[in-house]
A protein has these predicted regions:
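Residues located in well-ordered beta-strands
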Residues: 2, 16-19, 33, 72-74, ...
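N-terminal glycine-rich beta->alpha transition that marks the start or flank
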Residues: 11, 20-72
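A glycine-/small-residue-rich N-terminal strand-loop-strand element
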Residues: 71-97, 171
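A structural motif shared across PLP-dependent enzymes of the aminotransferase-like
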Residues: 95-109
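A glycine-rich, Thr/Ser-enriched phosphate-binding loop motif common to dinucleotide/cofactor-binding enzymes
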Residues: 117-140, 146, 153-156, 194
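N-terminal Rossmann-fold NAD(P) dinucleotide-binding loop
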Residues: 160-161
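Adenosine-nucleotide cofactor-binding segment
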Residues: 168-209
Length: 209
């Protein structure tokens, strides 16, 4: 299969388009024919070598290696012991170092999310890391109740937009911080009740008004 690998850490100029053997799923794993992949900060730091072992708790993969952690596609192979996934299923996933910069990827079955037919592969691949982060913040961190107020930083970013929508759906009022007027408009379009441009004012004082 075709893949994008790096043989040295650094910028995107170190990407190499190469042929590598097709992966095979082991016990508890699934093979996914990728239709779209996500590109997030985790991928950038992995490529540049700025995600050191002292932060991750695991060694950097040996070079050369295929990077990537998010993807969406169609299940084309099922390993031993997997019973809740079928060939042909449309799925998305996030799993660190799952080598998604390729045509196929092997993923642990429990990491898969089934994609509904009305959700594109592109959306599925792009939403996983940011969506899981937003879901954790919205439902596991603050014990928020309907009518509470939440401050969302970078409200016009990928995680911020998703988090705002989740909070609003739970009846939470949202104050979002942004860096430009255009981002303020976008944050409000996605549900923010009030926005603060932190370049123009001190958000820590504004939220108390």
């Amino acid at each position: 299969m075709k893949a994008v690998q790096i043989s040295r850490f650094g910028g995107p100029e170190h990407f190499e388009f190469v042929d590598v053997p097709d992966p095979s799923p082991g016990p508890g794993e699934v093979l996914v024919d990728l239709r779209a992949i996500g590109v997030n900060y985790r991928d950038v730091t992995s490529r540049s070598g700025e995600f050191p072992p002292e932060l991750t708790g695991k060694p950097m993969p040996p070079l050369p290696y295929v990077t990537g952690s998010e993807g969406a596609g169609i299940v084309s192979g099922i390993g031993e012991g997997v019973s809740d996934v079928r060939l042909g299923d449309r799925v998305a996933f996030h799993e660190n170092d799952s080598r998604t910069y390729a045509e196929k990827a092997v993923v642990r079955a429990w990491r898969l999310v089934t994609l509904p037919d009305n959700l594109s592969f592109e959306t599925g691949a792009a939403i996983m890391l940011q969506g899981l982060t937003a879901e954790f913040l919205a439902h596991d961190c603050g014990n928020l109740k309907p009518g509470d107020i939440a401050l969302v930083h970078s409200a016009a970013g990928g995680t911020g937009l998703l988090l705002t929508q989740m909070l609003k759906r739970s009846g939470i009022r949202v104050i979002g911080t942004v860096s430009t007027d255009n981002k303020a408009v976008l944050a409000k379009e996605f549900g923010a009740d009030y926005t603060i441009n932190y370049r123009d004012s001190d958000f820590s004082q504004e939220v108390l008004r």
